[in-house]
Amino acid sequence: MAEIQDLLTENQVIEGVQNFLYQKGHTTHRRVVTVADAARKEHGVDLVFKLENDKGHGNWYFIEAKGNLKSDGTPMLSKHSTNFRWAIAQIILDIKVDSRNNNYIYGIAMPRSDIEHCKKLIEDNWALKHLRLRLYGAFCQDGKLTAVEYLPKDLYK
């Protein structure tokens, strides 16, 4: 039976989403543009990733991540709903381009164990539906970090 771990640091969540995005899509080029290091408390979007074709056209992913463990591996004191609200605020403040008219995809990544609670927080939120915000649930299975993507059609009523 596969061992699944849902308690992750922010850096592990970022790595899981990055691994997932490398496997996603049919494009020939996948590249990481920026990765923040939570242990060094770097500012800005945590992960900027681009899936592109030979001509450089494609989708830009801007992901804000939150873990349920501190960078030293100890449990977080705040609840997942507080971390999620903080991530929403950060991603909204970082939005520079309307995602409806461009190939910009905004998302929030967190441990998969926190996803169901966060889905309930946003399912009726018109603004987040309008932004087409995605969720990514990171987890570790058999020693490999990966993630599950939750699309807007699955999140909002």
Enumerate the language-model features and the residues they cover.
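Acidic-basic catalytic patches of nuclease active cores, encompassing PD-(D/E)XK
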Residues: M1-H43, L51-G56, N101
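Amphipathic coiled-coil/heptad-repeat helices and related helical stalk/stem segments
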Residues: H43-G44, A87
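A structural micro-motif
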Residues: H26, Y104, L131-L133
